[in-house]
Amino acid sequence: MTKKIDSKELPPFEYPQGYQLFAGVDEVGRGPLVGAVVTAAVILDPNNPIEGLTDSKKLTEKKRDLLFPEIQEKALAWSLGRCEAHEIDELNILQATMVAMQRAIAGLKVTPDFALIDGNKVPELPMAGLAVVKGDLRVQEISAASILAKVTRDREMEVLDKEFPQYGFAKHKGYPTKAHFAAIEEHGVISEHRRSFKPVKRVLGIE
């Protein structure tokens, strides 16, 4: 059984010395069978702090929705990036995530000196970068990015749900749940489904 890591057990993050502007970068949507992988990059303003930043998955939907506009308003810069389902199929999910992160950073109106990436892999960037394991719990910039990315993708799934209510996207957000599998088996796949993912391949008979 995997032990859940409490943020209090994690070592405090030490920011690399000699840099001024840090961008936090995170992604949402690597696991779902449908839709884009969405990324965000955020440079926070030390003179305009935001209370309550943490991993977006640890916050209620209501709290995320409250923080979403506050981050956009108070950050020095923020940007969203994405790779669509067809790009994920062409590249693979890891490479597509790296590209989406590159797009988020490239979209920042202020150029950061250093990029802090949640996870264990840094995409090729024009500035220094560091992968931070559990960064969404340890680094406020990454926490802010995780909230922007999650709220954005969740809202996209709610829009898709209105177009295709039979799939239940608003509930499971495209993740591989029993309800999602059952809907695919009954109704087939839509253009937003990731055809390179095994459960989708199975329904299409292209395993």
From Swiss-Prot:
Protein name in UniProt: Ribonuclease HII
Homology family: Belongs to the RNase HII family.
A cellular component term, taken from the record's GO annotations: cytoplasm
GO BP terms: DNA replication, removal of RNA primer; mismatch repair
Domain RNase H type-2: 20-207
PROSITE patterns per UniProt: RNASE_H_2
Record CDD domains: RNase_HII_bacteria_HII_like
PANTHER family with a match to the protein in the record: RIBONUCLEASE H2 SUBUNIT A, RIBONUCLEASE HII
Location(s), subcellular: Cytoplasm
Top-level division of the source organism's lineage: Bacteria
Gene: rnhB
Organism: Aliivibrio salmonicida (strain LFI1238)
